[in-house]
Amino acid sequence: MSSLCYSASRPLFVEHPDETQFHWSKRGSAFLCDFRGSSYAVLARHTVAPYKPEQLRIPVHDGFTAFFSFDYHWQPQGADDCHDIFVLRLTTTANDGDWLGSRAPIESQASAAAASAFVPGGGLAVSGYPGIGENEIDYERNTITNQRFIVEAEYCSSTNEHVHLLRARQSNVINDFGGYSGGLVIARFAEGLVPAGVVITGSAQSSLMRFIDVQGLYLSLDNFAAQVDAA
């Protein structure tokens, strides 16, 4: 996989229709993926609460307020860390800026490939929007600017079924990891990059992030797709 995998991440906002002045607020990160030929956005479920799914807004590209459209949404049942996933099925068809080409492919082979990086010190990276750098909502120009940050990381350990810890390699540049919730975890190999999971929580003080692995994500998307097909 090429470095396009890094550009699969997007900032996540919610829209406040009753607010006359401030229409959007940032909630974290999301990332775009391709599963069996359909497009999805993956989020950390806790970033959605207490808002309604129809309030969620994900920009097609940084710098604009053109948002992805979606129809179905899904979340697993349960309160464990492995259930902290929220998925949207995207219905946007116009491929402006080739966002289709930046989607992270979620395949059964990716699970096996990523798992080989799940050893102490295994090479990982996180792509998301921690809220530093250039971040602005310009209501007069109707633009949203957020800066994506990619941080290198190393695998630490497994904490639960499909849930793991990684340690970000950063020297206190990022003071809060909350914005990375919903960001894409990537396994780095000499041959290229492989989707490895989704960030759920993190602590900048310890430089640790907790993430759900790509196998758990694959199972969630498989469940979601089956329910949509049966609808």
Describe the residue ranges of each PLM region.
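Catalytic histidine site
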Residues: 2-72, 86, 91, 152-158, ...
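Extended, non-catalytic subsegments within catalytic or DNA/protein-binding/adaptor domains
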Residues: 49-61, 82, 95-101, 137-151
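A basic- and aromatic-enriched beta-loop-alpha substructure that forms the phosphate/nucleotide-
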Residues: 68-104
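A structural micro-motif recognizing beta-strand termini
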Residues: 89-95, 109, 166-176
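Short glycine/Trp-rich loop-beta-loop segment that forms part of the substrate-binding cleft
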Residues: 105-144
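A mid-sequence, solvent-exposed acidic-amphipathic segment
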Residues: 129-178, 182
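Catalytic nucleophile loop of clan PA
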Residues: 173-199
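Juxtadomain coupling helices with adjacent low-complexity linkers
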Residues: 215-231
